[in-house]
Amino acid sequence: MNYKPVKAVMLRNNDKFIDVDSVITVTNFKMNFREDIVTFTATKEDGSASQRWTEMNRIINKVIS
């Protein structure tokens, strides 16, 4: 699995990134410029989903292949 570091603000729907607990698929991506955060629904490989948020400038490891 290849990945590259990108800022969280560069994520889009259906992108995948590596988190501490598994590979996460992003859906329902929204940017909140007032609070400088992004919110999204994170779906793990086992099918469980949760609402998450992170700072726009946070570096994440986006899966590219």
Regions found by a protein language model. Give the residues of each.
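Mixed-charge, Lys/Arg-rich low-complexity intrinsically disordered regions
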Residues: 1-12
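Short, functionally important structural connectors and interaction interfaces within domains
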Residues: 1-3, 21, 46, 52
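Residue-level marker for the onset of beta-strands and adjacent loop->beta junctions
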Residues: 12-14, 38
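Short coil-to-beta-strand transition motifs
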Residues: 16-25
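Basic/aromatic-rich interaction segments and small domains that mediate binding to polyanionic partners
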Residues: 27-53
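Intrinsically disordered, low-complexity, charged/polar segments
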Residues: 47-65
